[in-house]
């Protein structure tokens, strides 16, 4: 466990290393050449993490939470006469639908139960029947439950039917290997405070250059204009249009260096995967069962069903917080669950200490 007042067992914000925190002790100017050069390095490193075909893609950094970046894509990429198909099985897919509706974008939904992955057969049926669909969006890791959706199949179908593909990889990018060129992803969205293990403050979009160039003049917002943000960064050496989160960018750059030092995305995936397997096995020993089938479960966060009896999540939360752990309440609409994340600077000994705290009767007697 790192030096921290709590170990965050959440899907982000998450527990960061001491060295990531330390780089935020200093102040920087947004116009400084050294800072803008760092922004350019960050952009390049993100593309190299995303694909080997780096010349075809570019990165746009966007102030705010990851949701801001998702909305920047939805509001900038889809033209006025466009139509969006959203695959949803959780809160974050629903949020994309809500964005589209607020922005007066024609939207159709393929919905499955929160503990079931996107139904590829239904998606293809919708694409066959509705020729007006121009774009298709899917959440890779839906942290409502921790389920992984079949983005390979969704994107393959999307391209088979000539659609632009949008992937919300908020809680998977940097923790699960993804080659966006191989998967034919046109726009991938993620955030600083997820698997790369930075802190909150900006999101980013890795975009296919050819598709991004089509977005000029389409944005439905000034501050969330994806094309204008990219054009400024691209042509003015990493400059942001409006005040950027300088401390967060420095922390993120440090986090990228630490990802490389750990061994890259594959090594980080292995740590997360081992954390999650240990968590499920140990929690199973004391009577807690995950809601998601193992074959669909991500290594990011796990939803556990409330056990029978007099179980109160708030008591669990309060007691674990006293012992230095913070977990997440459930977000599933039909089943009582709570969630435990295992990303961030979290290791085997941390998972064991957590479950030991529960098993000893700290919460459940």
Swiss-Prot record:
The modification N6-(pyridoxal phosphate)lysine is found at residue 194. Its cofactor is pyridoxal 5'-phosphate. InterPro entries: Aminotrans_V_dom, NH2EtPonate_pyrv_transaminase, PyrdxlP-dep_Trfase, PyrdxlP-dep_Trfase_major, PyrdxlP-dep_Trfase_small, SP_NH2Trfase/AEP_transaminase. It catalyses: (2-aminoethyl)phosphonate + pyruvate = phosphonoacetaldehyde + L-alanine. Its EC number is 2.6.1.37. Involved in phosphonate degradation. Homodimer. This is 2-aminoethylphosphonate--pyruvate transaminase. It comes from Bacillus cereus (strain ZK / E33L).
